[in-house]
Amino acid sequence: MLDRIKACFTESIQTQIAAAEALPDAISRAAMTLVQSLLNGNKILCCGNGTSAANAQHFAASMINRFETERPSLPAIALNADNVVLTAITNDRLHDEVYAKQVRALGHAGDVLLAISTRGNSRDIVKAVEAAVTRDMTIVALTGYDGGELAGLLGQQDVEIRIPSHRSARIQEMHMLTVNCLCDLIDSTLFPHQDE
């Protein structure tokens, strides 16, 4: 059992090292995309399923409340957080549309959709991205594996942060770290003197 525990830590560390080599440019571009949208008076919609939903909610909470230092609230909405909306849509057997309907209702040109999907193939996330494209939104996608169907939907203005792993647990861990990096970069760019 102890060896298995050590193996989990070792694999996680190795994934972090690989991500630290491969992802800084994509994370930087994603952060600047989010910052520019906020500076233009727009908002960030975010969504995910399971652990990815938790990461989406963590991002939205860190924008609305704060990340590590006090600062003004920033507009972000986790589309997976409203159980009444979610169950109303799924009750009509529109599972694949659970986020797309919200994107069409709430998204505007200049907004950003932060779409989090471990494999990039979740139908409801793919449909949300398709809806965001029709609304002239920019997409920041956090993926893993080969990026899945989601990666193929992204345009030149969009950013994919693909974790270099084929293990869901490692990808989800790195998605959380990436979300924290994005929050830190947004805060340090928009409020450079808040932590002094």
Curated annotation (Swiss-Prot):
Superkingdom: Bacteria
InterPro entries: DiaA, GmhA/DiaA, SIS_dom, SIS_dom_sf, SIS_GmhA/DiaA_subfam
SUPFAM superfamilies given in the database record: SIS domain (SSF53697)
GO biological process terms, semicolon-separated: carbohydrate derivative metabolic process; DNA replication
Keywords on record: DNA replication
Stretches assigned to the SIS domain: 34-196
Gene Ontology MF, one: carbohydrate derivative binding
Known partners and oligomeric status: Homotetramer; dimer of dimers.
Family indicated by similarity: Belongs to the SIS family. DiaA subfamily.
Record function comment: Required for the timely initiation of chromosomal replication via direct interactions with the DnaA initiator protein.
Record's protein name: DnaA initiator-associating protein DiaA
Organism: Serratia proteamaculans (strain 568)
Phylogenetic placement of the source organism: Bacteria, Pseudomonadati, Pseudomonadota, Gammaproteobacteria, Enterobacterales
